[in-house]
């Protein structure tokens, strides 16, 4: 039987719509068809997929405290990005705290964390620093304070490097934007922290808490970072 060339006007969409839909992210070896200057070619999905792989997310409402994620760190990836978007506590002037979790348990014993940060704000030239050597959490945000106004939410990235490692302390570093209670003064904060109780602890999750009340709005997205 002679082959017939399919042209734009003679292509029946049912060729695609009538086929079983893929209900997940394509595997790296799945193939797609593209047009390269008019020439059809096939390409493995691995060449075009993002290096950020969605793992989990939550949109916060009400008065949530703590916000917990279990089983989000695994041997599949050794780097993770936690994206915070307009995270707002219920009340002003509260500390926002990060803790690792091991299975279903929060790692929160005294004198097991250390953290350091520096920040600047839009109405001052001075740099504010915060450093703590023995704590039960990692405080994040400018002067460790969060504010409740929608224009004052915490946004930015927390980077988690190799949390499943048993040869280094579980640690984070972050780059965040916050603001004062009315949202007019912007704060930029960078910092780092580590759980230093045991090198052999392979953490599997984390939680964010407020020193009082909880979070009323905002979003947290977790991505695994594929190695290039």
Label each PLM-derived region with a short phrase.
Residues 2-4:
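Cleaved targeting-peptide boundary
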Residues 8-20, 30-40, 44-228:
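Surface-exposed molecular-recognition determinants
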């Amino acid at each position: 039987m002679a082959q017939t060339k399919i042209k734009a006007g003679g292509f029946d969409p049912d060729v695609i719509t009538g086929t079983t839909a893929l209900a997940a992210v394509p595997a790296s070896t799945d193939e797609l068809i593209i047009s390269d200057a008019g020439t059809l070619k096939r390409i493995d999905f691995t060449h075009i997929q993002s290096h950020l792989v969605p793992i989990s997310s939550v949109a916060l409402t009400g008065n949530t405290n703590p916000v917990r994620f279990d089983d989000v760190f695994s041997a599949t990836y050794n780097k993770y990005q936690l994206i915070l978007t307009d995270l707002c506590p219920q009340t002003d002037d509260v500390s926002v705290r990060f803790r690792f979790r091991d299975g279903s348990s929060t790692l929160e014993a005294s004198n097991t964390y250390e953290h350091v940060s520096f920040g600047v704000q839009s109405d001052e030239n001075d740099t504010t620093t915060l450093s703590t050597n023995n704590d039960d959490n990692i405080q994040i945000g400018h002067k460790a304070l969060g504010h409740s106004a929608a224009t004052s939410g915490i946004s930015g990235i927390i980077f988690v490097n190799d949390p499943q490692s048993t040869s280094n302390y579980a640690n984070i570093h972050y780059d965040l934007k916050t603001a004062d209670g009315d949202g007019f003064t912007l704060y930029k904060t960078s910092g780092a922290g580590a759980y230093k109780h045991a090198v052999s602890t392979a953490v599997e999750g984390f939680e964010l808490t407020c020193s009082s009340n909880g979070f009323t709005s905002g979003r947290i997205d977790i991505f695994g970072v594929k190695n290039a």
